[in-house]
């Protein structure tokens, strides 16, 4: 593959490393060996080459941008933690989301309730979304898939080598792909407002409850500290003689002071 003209931003490299998107599995399939950079000796985990991942991101974004109508691209994820990222990706790129259970015959049976006739298929995991990948091959769909080192890449046209077993890494991959698509279409900067990646990440309800409780504890602690500081300031003011309220000063004393000053 020719060297890409779009350099990968440092923020994207940090995002892939933090989300552990560069960490594959212990095993490697034959067709995924070309994307392996090395092996961690302690855990025996394969490390994916980020440069090759970036090349495939650009290739996938170019395929998406070649569509006349973005809704002709269908994004599928049967995993629970991949649904939010898919919905946010489709909101950003105007693609068609398919989340939850994939109904057999969606692509090749017109008798189903909501048949689809897309031109491009994007899946978060070719193993979990195997039914969609197989049906896409029957109707000659161009398939883009986020693949781990031990995935079978049969019927996949563009492989994006990335960790697809982590909720954060899948969300990071969809975020990067959406940014590339918007950059190619509108020229929007790639690394602008990187905090938007939080909108792609799935949060478990139990985890959200813990975060809310922690936030309440922090707020209560801040309120307690603020009240203590206010109390200490009042005590200091009273000791220094600053705690006299204006209402306690008589008007006669003020007028007498002003008369003496005039004289």
Swiss-Prot record:
One of its GO terms (cellular component) is cytosolic small ribosomal subunit. The keyword GTP-binding does not apply. Gene3D superfamilies: Glucose-6-phosphate isomerase like protein, domain 1 (3.40.50.10490). InterPro entries: Ribosomal_uS2, Ribosomal_uS2_euk, Ribosomal_uS2_euk/arc, Ribosomal_uS2_flav_dom_sf. It holds the Pfam family Ribosomal_S2. One of its GO terms (biological process) is ribosomal small subunit assembly. GO terms for molecular function: structural constituent of ribosome. It is found in: Cytoplasm. Component of the small ribosomal subunit. Mature ribosomes consist of a small (40S) and a large (60S) subunit. The 40S subunit contains about 33 different proteins and 1 molecule of RNA (18S). The 60S subunit contains about 49 different proteins and 3 molecules of RNA (25S, 5.8S and 5S). Interacts with RPS21. Required for the assembly and/or stability of the 40S ribosomal subunit. Required for the processing of the 20S rRNA-precursor to mature 18S rRNA in a late step of the maturation of 40S ribosomal subunits. This is Small ribosomal subunit protein uS2. It comes from Vairimorpha ceranae (strain BRL01) (Microsporidian parasite). The gene is RPS0.
């Amino acid at each position: 593959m020719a060297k890409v003209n779009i350099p990968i931003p440092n923020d994207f490299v940090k995002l892939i490393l933090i989300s552990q998107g560069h960490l594959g599995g212990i095993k490697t399939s034959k067709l995924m060996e070309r994307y392996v950079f090395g092996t961690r000796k302690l855990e025996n985990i394969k490390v994916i080459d980020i440069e090759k991942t970036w090349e495939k991101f650009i290739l996938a974004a170019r395929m998406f941008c070649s569509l006349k109508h973005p809704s002709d691209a269908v994004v599928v994820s049967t995993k629970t933690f991949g649904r939010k990222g898919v919905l946010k990706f489709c909101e950003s790129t105007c693609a068609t989301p398919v989340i939850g259970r994939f109904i057999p015959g969606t692509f090749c049976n017109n008798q189903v309730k909501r048949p689809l006739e897309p031109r491009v298929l994007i899946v978060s995991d070719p193993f979990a979304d195997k039914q969609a990948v197989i049906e896409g091959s029957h109707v000659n769909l161009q398939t883009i898939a986020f693949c781990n080192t031990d995935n079978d890449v049969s019927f996949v046209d563009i492989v994006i080598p990335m960790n697809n077993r982590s909720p954060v890494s899948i969300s990071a991959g969809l975020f990067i792909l959406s940014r590339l698509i918007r950059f190619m279409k509108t020229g929007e900067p790639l690394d602008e407002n990187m905090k938007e990646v939080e909108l792609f990440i799935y949060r478990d309800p139990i985890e959200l409850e813990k975060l809310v409780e922690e936030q309440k504890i922090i707020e209560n602690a801040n309120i307690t500290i603020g009240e203590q500081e206010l109390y200490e300031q009042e005590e200091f003011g009273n000791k220094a003689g600053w705690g006299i309220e204006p209402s306690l000063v008589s008007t006669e004393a003020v007028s007498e002071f002003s008369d003496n000053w005039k004289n």
